[in-house]
């Protein structure tokens, strides 16, 4: 029995031992700080000391996984097989290639990031990753949907400068350092203002069509539903039209029908790519378990497959988002936050894993 215990203790990794030692440390809280704040600071410090080693191990794991997949694909091709992995591999390679020319849509999307002060550090990180994914969706779309990131002048900008410094090389994306949304709106021209629509989940006005020469505003906030009617109240105070995507027709959600900022932008891009069919757009963008049914007859929900026929798949976790601020470990081995955005090693594209919370 003692030999088994000895073997198990020897198998424990150095990181696990270090973590246990860290937990056993007697916490002496400095004056003026709460115990929770101080423990968070200690975790931040520990993460800063170990993040390079963690990132290196993660890169090595990804590289090994790619090599294993390549070997399986080579073997399948040599045997004349056409398995699902081989098909997905070639589909993935094609998806990474951005179109040389994009079709103009005459539609603009504004991500209103004026809510900076309402988010904590982790939520700022999540929003920055959502913006990065939105840029990837825009870059790979066959249709050009204009994208402006506004009120880009506080914590969000600091996050980009620290973790995503290459953002200033992004093409066809405008970062606007205004203080308030009304600073960039034609407030004195009612006719021009009528072509601005603020997207919010808190309205019955459904948007069936993205109209040319119109601007659609997405609230750039990750708040886990803390702030009710935030975008609605702001739109009404500015005299803007409001609307929401036809969420209830195509997806099943408990409570408020709220989508992530990146999902809203991706849906707009996919709407154009799928012959202006919201049903097909929702099927491409959202996790399968949230879609009411995989539509086979356009966007008519009456002709869709029953929800029970759609295979349930887990929603991707936020673990891969790798944020920078308020770094906290998710488990005993993997911290939540990271110095870099979620980009693939072979390109400047982010991962497609969702992060919920925006009021849309």
UniProtKB/Swiss-Prot annotation:
GO terms for biological process: tRNA N1-guanine methylation. The keyword Nucleus applies. Residues 94-293 form the SAM-dependent MTase TRM10-type domain. It holds the Pfam family tRNA_m1G_MT. S-adenosyl-L-methionine binds at residues 199-200, 219, 223-227, 231, 245, 257-259. GO terms for molecular function: tRNA (guanosine(9)-N1)-methyltransferase activity; tRNA binding. Residues 56-67 have a biased composition (Basic residues). Gene3D superfamilies: 3.40.1280.30. It catalyses: guanosine(9) in tRNA + S-adenosyl-L-methionine = N(1)-methylguanosine(9) in tRNA + S-adenosyl-L-homocysteine + H(+). Residues 307-324 have a biased composition (Low complexity). Belongs to the class IV-like SAM-binding methyltransferase superfamily. TRM10 family. S-adenosyl-L-methionine-dependent guanine N(1)-methyltransferase that catalyzes the formation of N(1)-methylguanine at position 9 (m1G9) in cytoplasmic tRNA. This is tRNA (guanine(9)-N1)-methyltransferase. It comes from Debaryomyces hansenii (strain ATCC 36239 / CBS 767 / BCRC 21394 / JCM 1990 / NBRC 0083 / IGC 2968) (Yeast). The lineage of its organism: Eukaryota, Fungi, Dikarya, Ascomycota, Saccharomycotina.
């Amino acid at each position: 029995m003692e030999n088994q215990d000895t073997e198990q203790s020897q198998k424990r990794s150095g990181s696990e031992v270090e973590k246990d030692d860290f937990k056993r440390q007697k916490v002496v809280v400095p004056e003026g700080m709460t115990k929770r704040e101080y423990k968070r600071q200690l975790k931040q410090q520990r993460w800063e000391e170990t993040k390079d080693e963690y990132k290196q191990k993660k890169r090595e794991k990804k590289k090994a996984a790619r090599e294993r997949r390549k070997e399986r694909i080579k073997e399948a091709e040599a045997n004349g097989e056409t398995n699902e992995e081989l098909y997905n591999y070639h589909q993935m390679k094609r998806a990474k290639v951005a179109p040389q020319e994009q079709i103009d849509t005459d539609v603009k999307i504004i991500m209103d990031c004026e809510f900076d002060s309402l988010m904590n550090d982790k939520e700022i990180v999540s929003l920055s990753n959502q913006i990065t994914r939105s840029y990837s969706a825009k870059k790979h779309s066959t249709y050009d949907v204009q994208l402006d990131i506004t009120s880009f002048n506080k914590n969000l900008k600091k996050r980009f400068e620290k973790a995503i410094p290459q953002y200033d090389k992004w093409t066809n994306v405008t970062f606007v350092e205004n203080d308030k949304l009304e600073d960039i709106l034609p407030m004195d021209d009612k006719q021009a203002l009528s072509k601005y629509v603020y997207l919010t989940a808190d309205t019955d006005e459904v948007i069936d069509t993205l109209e040319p020469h119109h601007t659609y505003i997405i609230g750039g906030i990750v708040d886990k539903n803390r702030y009710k009617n935030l975008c609605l109240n702001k739109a009404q105070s500015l005299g803007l039209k409001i609307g929401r995507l036809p969420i209830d027709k195509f997806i099943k959600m408990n409570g408020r029908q709220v989508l992530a900022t990146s999902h809203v932008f991706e849906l707009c891009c996919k709407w154009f790519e799928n012959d202006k069919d919201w049903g097909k757009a929702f099927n491409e963008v959202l996790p399968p378990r949230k879609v009411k049914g995989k539509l086979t007859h356009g966007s008519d929900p009456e002709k869709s497959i029953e929800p029970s026929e759609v295979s349930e798949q887990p929603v991707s976790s936020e673990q891969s988002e790798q944020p920078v601020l308020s770094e906290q470990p998710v488990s005993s081995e993997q911290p939540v936050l990271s110095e870099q955005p979620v980009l693939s090693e072979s390109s400047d594209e982010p991962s497609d894993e969702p992060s919920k919370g925006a009021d849309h």
